UniProtKB/Swiss-Prot annotation:
Entry keywords, A to Z: DNA-binding, Fatty acid biosynthesis, Fatty acid metabolism, Lipid biosynthesis, Lipid metabolism, Repressor, Transcription, Transcription regulation
Pfam families (UniProt xref): 4HBT
Function: Transcriptional factor involved in regulation of membrane lipid biosynthesis by repressing genes involved in fatty acid and phospholipid metabolism.
Gene symbol of the encoding locus: fapR
Family note: Belongs to the FapR family.
Xref: SUPFAM superfamilies: Thioesterase/thiol ester dehydrase-isomerase
Protein name (Swiss-Prot/TrEMBL): Transcription factor FapR
């Protein structure tokens, strides 16, 4: 059963508040309307498109990073709890894929995960000491990859961080990173 325009707009606003990373296509499916209708409703509600919503969330999180400049993070940092966990998103573009197969280059997924680990640690100097990674599924042109990093262990100069990357709900990459850090007072 389709909702009336006012009810649908209210429901769209609530859906985006609950998940600011929901796509217009996903909203189309959820509310059984065309993409043009979703775009008109978003415009009427003064809700920016997905890319702008991601950038707004990312800008708020960059302030919490100490070891990297915002432009050094691969992907958009969408959540960071210093020394505990972080998440980022990256859209796979033409520059990120092999021309013939349209499959993402592995170093892009690795760079997203690795820079997320550096951004997560709230120290001035953070370096990757070792990593163990696995590429689980292929990632294609225009996919959006969500990387989630969680600290699993901390010692006097190291963090061990697990990273899982997803396209929608499918895991595409996983890795364990041992990160070396130096405190400012050292």
């Amino acid at each position: 059963m389709k909702l009336k325009k006012a009810e649908r707009r209210q429901a769209i606003q609530k859906a985006i508040e609950l998940n600011p990373f929901i796509t217009d296509s996903e909203l189309c499916e959820q509310f059984e309307v065309s993409i043009q209708t979703i775009r008109l409703d978003r415009t009427n509600l003064s809700i920016p498109e997905l890319r702008k919503r991601i950038k707004l969330v990312a800008e708020q999180n960059y302030e919490q990073i100490r070891a990297l400049e915002a432009n050094e993070v691969v992907g958009d940092l969408i959540q960071v709890e210093p020394n505990i966990s972080a998440q980022s998103l990256i859209e796979i573009t033409e520059e990120s894929v092999f021309t013939k197969t349209q499959i993402a280059r592995g170093h892009v997924l690795f760079a997203q995960a690795n820079s997320l680990c550096v951004a997560l640690i709230h120290k001035s100097t953070v370096l990757t000491q070792e990593s163990n990674v696995a590429f689980i599924e292929k990632v294609k042109l225009n996919d959006t990859v969500r990387a989630e990093a969680h600290v699993v262990n901390k010692t006097s100069h190291h963090y061990v961080i697990e990273v899982n990357s997803y396209v929608r709900d499918t895991i595409v990459f996983k890795g364990t990173f041992k990160m070396f850090y130096i405190s400012e007072d050292e």
